[in-house]
């Protein structure tokens, strides 16, 4: 909450509060900002929680936004191509967390694809520019 204001848009790229001892609405009601959930494969508890919806501005499988003058596709899953990917748009995805497997190796070749995994971003909300820096730092550990 110290990094998010009440007016900020916060995009959760799936797997919200997975393996948690509390209900999703318990977390959502405490978090600042306009929260948008991009559905992940571990979001059944959030989707089934009746009270969670009142804390979410949107719930989508995929969303396209413009932020900081950039076209961005948000999807829980890493994609080989995405909306306007050949025209300079960015992809922000989750799902693979901090894995360094063949999917990770492939996604490193996608110039404007960013892993929003919490483990890559110090388990804290980040801006677009911080996401870029954190992905670069994570990839530099491969060298």
Positions of predicted regions on the chain:
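Core catalytic region of metal-dependent phosphoesterases/phosphodiesterases
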Residues: 1-62
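Conserved beta-sheet core of the metallophosphoesterase superfamily
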Residues: 52-142
């Amino acid at each position: 909450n110290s990094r998010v204001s009440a007016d900020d848009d916060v995009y959760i790229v799936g797997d919200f509060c997975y393996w948690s001892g509390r209900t999703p609405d318990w977390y959502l009601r405490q978090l600042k900002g306009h929260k948008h959930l991009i559905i992940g494969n571990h979001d059944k508890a959030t989707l089934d929680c009746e009270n969670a919806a009142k804390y979410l501005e949107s719930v989508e499988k995929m969303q396209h936004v413009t932020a900081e003058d950039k076209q961005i596709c948000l999807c829980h899953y890493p994609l080989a191509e995405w909306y306007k990917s050949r025209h300079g748009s960015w992809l922000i995805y989750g799902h693979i967390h901090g894995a360094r497997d063949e999917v990770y190796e492939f996604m490193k070749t996608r110039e404007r694809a960013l892993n929003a995994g919490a483990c890559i971003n110090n388990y804290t909300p980040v801006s677009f520019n911080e996401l870029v820096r954190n992905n670069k730092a994570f990839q530099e550990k491969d060298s």
